[in-house]
Amino acid sequence: MNWALHVSASLPFFTAPSQADAGILAPQVQAVGRAAARALCDELALAPKPGLVSFADTGSHDDMDAHTFMRSIFALRPYYERITVLGMARAPFAALERCGIEAERHMLAATGGINTHRGAIFMLGLLCAAAGVLIGQGQPLDASALRQALLTQWGDALSTRADRTPTLPGGMASARLGLRSAGREAALGLPTLFETALPAWQQAERSGLA
């Protein structure tokens, strides 16, 4: 069975692409998975990063190092391809959430129970799913289209999720300090990424700094 069709057929709650479509689109899905894994490697390589793990040191952590992160990245690469396929099929958010929970299990198995990439499973996974929507529609993967696909396809579900009482440390800290949580960022279409970080990166590139 074709690779992309096999992956999508193994996941519930959505219609798999046809075999012909899956055969055409599989290289694009794999390219998204490679880009996601490369982004995680680049983040790990970035130094200095006060408090955070890099190849230079472990920051403020005594339970993880760069090797822990690399094991996690290798374990998560298939997840980013799987969630891209879910995006191609415009799967409901519940299917994305199930896929992310399974990815978290793989991460914890690879790291011995250490949370290295829970945030990246959520945020980067959503971006891959949005990329899948655009791939399925034959659209280019530019930033504005990526953000719009995320909001159009899963914005309502993300808003509902963001309204839940937080149970994870990051969400509870955000609520206590009056900050915008990761879930709320996602529900708003990742404004910090698209309105602040990306323009800063593009300006740095134009200035020859990146």
Report the location of each language-model feature.
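Phosphate-rich cofactor/ligand-interacting catalytic cores and adjacent structured alpha/beta frameworks
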Residues: 2-89, 93, 131-210
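Long, hydrophobic/aromatic-enriched structural stretches that serve as scaffold segments
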Residues: 78-133
